[in-house]
Amino acid sequence: VPEILITLGDPAGIGPEIIDAALASGNLPDGFDFRVIGDRSAGTPGKPDRASARAALDALEEAARLLRETDAAAVVTGPVSKEGLQEIGFPFPGQTEFFTHALHATETGMLLTGPHLTVGLATIHIPLAEVPNQLNPQNILSIGKLTAGFLKQRGIAQPRIAVCGLNPHAGENGAFGHEERNIISPAIASLNRAGIATFTGPHVPDAVFRDAAQGTYHAVIAMYHDQGLIPLKLLDFDEAVNVTLGLPKPRTSPDHGTAFAIAGKGIAKPDSMIAAIRLACQLA
């Protein structure tokens, strides 16, 4: 029976309660064993501290070890506090980068998927001011190929993928920036030469997400974190799932944070965690 690992996240957050609710929901597929990793006694709901951050990190490290050394099929990660982790010396911007390193992956990407939208990110956890410096054709090629592979794995034989511009109006032919002409368009041409999916763009960012949500495209490649996540969370907040693409084994997580302010109050919705576990089972 395939084993799906679930890390508790920061035990001072809503991770423990949404995992309990998901496992009790009756909405998970049969034929899998679910193994929860983490020490819930290390945190008091709503009161994050170094001990709760340490417990979150210990759970991640144990999950990575099990993925490397056992037949565990996939991991679903509970929400962590990036700030809390960095205070105890965690050297990565987020869990995506942690698993890339821990599982010795060479090319990974971050994708979020919900009922209305699937969005891949060309850049991830960097300051907005750094995006123009860090955006290059290789980023776009990489996430484009990974996103096409993800869609095919989910049964879409000929994916249609829209690639966003970076600037307002997708640069308006150079009037508002040159990244579209110099970086994004060449990457789209390379992706189409690879023949793995139909890539179009650079699209005007403010319009393309509506088209994608209505089914014109199977996914959108966004140039930076909030460009992709604002429309996704507006439409799919309760059911969106974060997926790390390119790992040797699937990793998913809910698309929300620790929600320390409501932890322990019994009001956190488990929908995104349920969706994350279901997707991990599909991909395993």
Please place each PLM-identified region on the residue numbering.
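Contiguous, glycine/small-aliphatic-enriched amphipathic segments in soluble metabolic enzymes
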Residues: 1-97, 134-223, 227-252, 256-258, ...
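A glycine-rich helix N-cap at a beta->alpha junction
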Residues: 96-106
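Conserved hydrophobic/aromatic beta-strand scaffold that supports enzyme active sites
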Residues: 98, 110, 119-121, 251
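Short beta-strand
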Residues: 111-112, 155
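Ligand-binding beta-strand-loop-alpha-helix segment within the catalytic cores
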Residues: 112-142
